[in-house]
Amino acid sequence: MIDWSRSYSCEWRVFRVDPETWADGARLGGVDSLEVQSDATGDVPLLDAGGMTVSGDVPPQGYYRIALTARQDGAIERADIATLLFEATGREVGRGTASVTLSGRSTLWPAQARLLTGGEYAPAGTDGAAWAAALLRSCCHAPVEVADGAGFALRDPVWGEAGASVLSHVWDVVRAGGRTLRVMGDGTIVVAPLPTVPALDLGGDFAAIIDPTARVALDVSEVPNRVTAIDGANVAVATNEDAGSPVSHQARGYWYDVVETSPTPAEGETLGAYAARRLRELSVVSDEREWVRGYVPGVRVGDLVRVAMGGALDGTYRIRTMGYDLGRGVTVTERASREVQLWV
């Protein structure tokens, strides 16, 4: 096995993928450049994307798998970085040479391209994970799996909107059960529980953050310190007067108000408890960090990573974006975030 925290030699190979068997096909020659990005942000994330430039002729569309073969002290290991649906976007012709530029989309793309006609919904009581997987299989060529523990019963029906994509409906269904979608390096789509255990320990199992100068973004400018809930003649107010909170009345020296005139308390919840709950919910902000690290197979966007290097970065974060630098090895520029509660 490769120790990915140490140096290794590697070879990059790109294979055409048979959409029927999902196995490697012929190797693609003449690959001049490769790029891969992963992004789990937004309402309907496609998760993976990329691009490549190829010398010579290449089919204008097809699935291709980007694979790394690493060698270290006699050990050999293959890691699939991404499998994407590539389409030609440009062609350059020179004196005796030609190159094609291709743009790669996630294996989820066919579900984003297909639109709902209206009336589609996932009924209450349905296994939401199985429902989502079936919808994806109806659109996508890639294998679709349901991970262990991903099944759940929908409490309420989830309706699809006419003109929305099948993928947006799938995301609505899986999020209703606190689940997520993952796309693995071989292109397999997985309906899975939201990860709760770190997939990577930076500073423990894997030592190196190559660029320890991390970008930090913690925006507290829109966090209120007073919520007023009004329900007819009834009024309830919740305030943040915690001197230890950076957004409290004491810390700011002024009130930042949110007024809700159509409150929706839970069953048995008083208006005062509702106002306090809303203030807590609105007091959660995203603590965002960015760093460069070495590549480790199997770590994907949406995973948790624990940083334990004895500095300001220490903590557990969820990976939001990954950019792969594919050269003599692989480095990953990673943006990750964690929720910070500013009032409890």
Give each language-model segment a name.
Residues 94-220:
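Charged- and aromatic-enriched interaction segments used to assemble
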Residues 1-21, 171, 185, 193-330, ...:
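Acidic, small/polar-enriched beta strand-loop surface segments
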Residues 32, 36-57, 97-110, 173, ...:
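Oligomerization/assembly interface segments of phage tail-like spikes and tubes
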